[in-house]
């Protein structure tokens, strides 16, 4: 499966700032059923541009999540993912499962907003989904992303996709 080897991602604007839902939780930014059509359209557009998947970005320059996946980054201080709440990000069961297991293995985990350049300089980046698994991101907008095969295996193990 191509996602197992890695994916090329295209950044697409979600059209809102990273804190757009902080003062307006009634807008239901993190409700999956309301965003399904947009997610399908984003994937279709990304694929029409030669990418395998999309990563939504905020208008203030932060990477948020994939249309059907959570974003995880490995850096010197552990694993990062995008915070939920003000960002309108859906809570990812797969990311939560991985972060719990990583913490039990002594790996630091945190939520934080991440700029495009930080992700390109990270040790690795992945899109995680309970259906599609753990997909290493090979490139974002045509820029290569460093690969960490050991961490890919660990993420897949923590998520329950490998032993």
Stretches found by the model and what they are:
Residues 1-163:
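Helix-start/capping segments and mature chain N-termini
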């Amino acid at each position: 499966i191509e996602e197992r080897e890695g994916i090329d991602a295209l950044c697409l604007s979600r059209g809102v700032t990273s804190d757009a839902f902080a003062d307006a939780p009634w807008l239901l930014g993190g409700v999956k059923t309301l965003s399904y059509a947009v997610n399908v359209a984003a994937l279709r557009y990304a694929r029409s541009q030669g990418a395998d998947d999309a990563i939504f970005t905020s208008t203030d320059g932060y990477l948020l999540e994939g249309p059907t996946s959570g974003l995880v980054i490995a850096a010197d201080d552990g694993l990062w993912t995008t915070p939920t709440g003000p960002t309108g990000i859906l809570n990812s069961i797969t990311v939560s499962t991985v972060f719990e297991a990583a913490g039990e293995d002594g790996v630091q985990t945190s939520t934080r907003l991440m700029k495009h350049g930080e992700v390109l300089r990270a040790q690795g980046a992945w899109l995680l989904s309970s259906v599609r698994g753990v997909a290493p991101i090979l490139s974002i907008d045509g820029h290569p992303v460093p690969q960490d095969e050991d961490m890919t295996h660990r993420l897949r193990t923590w998520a329950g996709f490998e032993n």
